[in-house]
Structure formats: structure tokens, C-alpha cells
Amino acid sequence: NMILLGIDAPNILHTNTLSESLADIQEKDRYDIVLANPPFGGKERKEVQLNFPIRSGETAFLFLQHFIKMLRAGGRGGIVIKNTFLSNTDNASVSLRKLLLESCQLHTVLDCPSGTFQGAGVKTVVLFFEKGAPTRKVWFYQLDPGRNLGKMNPLNDDDLAEFVKLQKTFADSPKSWTVDAKTFDPATFDLSVKNPNGGEEVTHRRPQAIMDEIAALDVENAEVLKRIRKLL
């Protein structure tokens, strides 16, 4: 992408963020805001996992720990992660939810529809939190654009307009509701709360639509590679 955009001298370090021990992060290294869509589904080596108090081969879980550590007190985070993080019962998931709820005010969970991130193949949520005080209440919003998302029909600003409006006051609606953190199971810290304001409807994409999307992505990737080869 940088070649195609004409960026000849990028100020980018080729390194593995996760190879940095959390114990080495000092106050001068911290930030006020972290916005990220970390890679999920990947696996990290055992020696890299040793850098984290909550060890997991899942890269997204390691990144989330890194982001929390990198925030200053009062710092804010907005992190994309697989929706299974909300309910998985493995030790790492439970411990990480506990860490998040006890060290940060997780004020918003945005439940994204299938197809939000093309090619990801999984449903995602966005966690919005502020580091410092523990979580008191969590506001949930189920994003429903009313259509199947795809490469030619992506999520847009209009789809997020209601979320942005309601989130300012954490208002209840047919798509949003608030949960007191005291009601979370203290053994699992399960965050997969059902919408109390209406039946939860699961929309499955047609197999043909999925196949068409895969074919379109293959064509696009082939075209990009062709252009890169011409530049080499």
C-alpha cells in the first residue's frame, strides 16, 4: 500500500510490539488515547507470552493487555476484538475480562454486525473504556444497519449516526441498554448480555453472497499484486 501511495520513506519500525515486556513500560511511554484493531486469530510463541501476566497464544488478548498498560490514568481506549471475547470460558478470557473490568471503566460495548470488517470471517465488538476506576455500568449497543454488509455495501457514517447520538447520554432504546457491573458473574465476568428491549435476531448471509465476496477479493488481490510487480 505504501508503494502504491508513493510513500518512499515511511517512519515505521519493523518490530514485534508484543516482544516488549509490560514490566518495562514506564510513565513516559504511555498515551492518553489508544485506538486499535489488533490482529486476532493469530498465535504467539511461548517466549513472547512470558512478557504478559495473562498468557495466551491469542494475539488479540496480548494486545489488549498491552493497550491497557500503555494508557495513562484517565486515558481512553477504543479496541476492536472478536465478540467471543465477551463469553469465552478459558482461563485467559476470564482473567482478561476481570482485568478490564477492575482496572478500567468499560463504559460502552458496540456489537458490530457480520460483514463489518471484510475478510475477517468473524463477528466483532468494539470496547470503549477509560483507565483508572473500575467499571460501574456498561452500555451496550447492537448495531443493525438493516442490510447485509459487503465489499460493495460497507458500513458508513449514517449507519453509526444513532449509536453516536445515543452514546453521548448512554440512552436506552430498542438497540441499546445499560447493565450494572454488580450483576456480572464474579466467577466468569461474562459480558455476553442479551438485549432486554427486544428479541435478538440473527441474520445469516446467503452462501452465494459469501462466495461472491471471496471471488471479488481474489480479483482485487490479483490486481494489486500485478501493480506491485510493475513497480519492482
Label for each model-derived stretch:
Residues 1-9:
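Short, conserved SAM-binding/catalytic segment
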Residues 14, 19-232:
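A conserved structural/catalytic subdomain of Rossmann-like adenosyl-cofactor enzymes
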